[in-house]
């Protein structure tokens, strides 16, 4: 089940919230949320709900063991068992294919469908076990409460990767107020708008230019396709995170921010402080720092982290290349850290955007031969020409969409919202400002929901990009 479906919006979510808020006690609310989360996950792939239950049970049990007996070998077994499920379900086919290619064998390639969200909930559950071992958090005695942490449907499938330490107190006790619900609804509607009104539409153009045959492709068409995919992946993934955070607010939870205007960055280092924050902080805290961090073997540590980051995104060599591409860029920035601040900010920003654009082209093409050909066209080395009438027409027709996406990636929407809030706050003494702000927000939410509903009713299904990770 996905957030951007009419069934979720008008059947599942309303009934879930109704049952949730009808419960007078927190235990009842937690039970409803667990039940709803299991139904949510099992909707498309019922059998894999048992895998999620097993991963939750594994880490719950190891948490109790590690609290009583903090042995490294116990933690190593826990990590190995968690990673084994990822290897079997996500990487088995990739490993066998490469063994066959390397050793000229003919082993049968496993055809295992990827459980949705396995990378997210496995990392989330594993972080709990490591935190218990480190004494950062007390082990949870109740399997039901731990299952709620792992399976909570707002962030189950595509994050943010929530740390147990951040929600442990909220599982035991949380407050509900109208303002939080109000803000949660707005955040959810913003995310829905990002996904349905922007990501899905630019994604169609990106697939048209990058996903089909390269016959007739031009340099400009490849640049336009990469730009559209750059917009798509941001609005798709940040839109999901907005919806997850919004639903969390409605239910009384506070999830971490996962995106902070990443395309406003002036360096790749800054970009990764703003993009998919829950993943980058996971690798920082559970891989980079334990390896030695900035204290020793810095570049080796970065190499390991970015190789793993690439593999986390998918079992394909292009994802490994994507991770290593960022490894190289981050190393270069470390080496030039004294010189880079001397370059004008606008130049650094434009160079950063160009480098990010290149990265998304690597990310998009899982077939390495197509990736190579795309870059030949991208840099005008294929003899295909700079543009043609088809590309020009596509560009002209999508200029308004490109403009809206560019503004949406900037600080303009946030700044505008803050200004409106401040103007309304000036009238807060007599209560008028608050009412005006509430009315404007309500109209804004309703408009986004209506437009998204119309779009969903007239279009085919578009899954979130990060569901496959």
What are these regions (language model features)?
Residues 1-468:
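Membrane-embedded transmembrane alpha-helical bundles that form the catalytic cores
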């Amino acid at each position: 089940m996905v957030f951007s479906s009419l069934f979720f919006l008008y059947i599942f979510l309303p009934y879930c919230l109704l049952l949730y808020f009808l419960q007078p006690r927190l235990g009842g609310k937690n039970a409803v949320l667990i039940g709803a989360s299991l139904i949510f996950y099992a909707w498309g792939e019922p059998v894999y709900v048992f895998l999620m239950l097993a991963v939750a049970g594994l880490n719950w049990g190891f948490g109790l063991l590690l609290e009583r007996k903090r042995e490294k070998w116990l933690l190593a077994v826990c990590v190995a068992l968690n990673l084994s499920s990822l290897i079997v379900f996500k990487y088995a086919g990739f490993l066998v294919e490469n063994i066959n290619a390397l050793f000229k064998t003919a082993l049968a390639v496993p055809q295992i469908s990827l459980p949705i969200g396995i990378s997210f909930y496995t990392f989330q559950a594993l972080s709990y076990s490591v935190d218990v071992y480190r004494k950062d958090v007390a082990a949870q005695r109740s399997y039901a409460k731990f299952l709620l942490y792992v399976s909570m449907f707002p962030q189950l499938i595509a994050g943010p990767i929530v740390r147990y330490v951040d929600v442990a107190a909220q599982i035991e006790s949380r407050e509900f107020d109208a303002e939080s619900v109000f803000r949660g609804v707005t955040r959810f509607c913003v995310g829905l708008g990002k996904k349905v009104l922007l990501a899905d539409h630019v994604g169609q153009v990106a697939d048209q230019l990058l996903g089909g045959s390269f016959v007739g492709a031009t340099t400009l068409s490849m640049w336009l396709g990469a730009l559209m995919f750059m917009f798509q992946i941001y609005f798709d993934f940040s839109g999901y995170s907005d919806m997850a955070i919004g639903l969390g607010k409605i239910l009384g939870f506070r999830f971490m921010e996962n995106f902070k205007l990443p395309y406003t960055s002036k360096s790749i280092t800054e970009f990764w402080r703003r993009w998919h924050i829950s993943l980058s902080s996971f690798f920082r805290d559970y891989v980079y720092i334990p390896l030695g961090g900035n204290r020793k073997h810095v570049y080796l540590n970065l190499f390991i982290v970015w190789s793993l980051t690439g593999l986390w995104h998918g079992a394909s060599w292009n994802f490994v290349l994507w991770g290593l591409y960022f490894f190289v860029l981050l190393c270069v920035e470390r080496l030039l850290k004294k010189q880079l601040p001397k370059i004008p900010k606008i130049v650094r920003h434009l160079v950063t955007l160009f480098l990010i654009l290149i990265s998304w082209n690597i990310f998009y093409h899982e077939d390495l031969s197509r990736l190579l050909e795309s870059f030949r066209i991208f840099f005008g080395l294929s003899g295909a020409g700079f543009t043609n009438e088809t590309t020009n027409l596509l560009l002209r027709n999508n200029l308004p969409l490109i403009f809206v996406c560019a503004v949406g990636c900037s600080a303009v929407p946030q700044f505008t919202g803050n200004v409106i809030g401040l103007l309304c706050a000036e009238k807060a003494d007599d209560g008028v400002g608050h009412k005006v702000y509430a009315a404007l927000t309500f109209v804004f939410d309703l408009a986004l929901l209506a437009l998204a509903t119309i779009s969903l009713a007239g279009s085919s299904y578009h899954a979130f990009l990060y569901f496959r990770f």
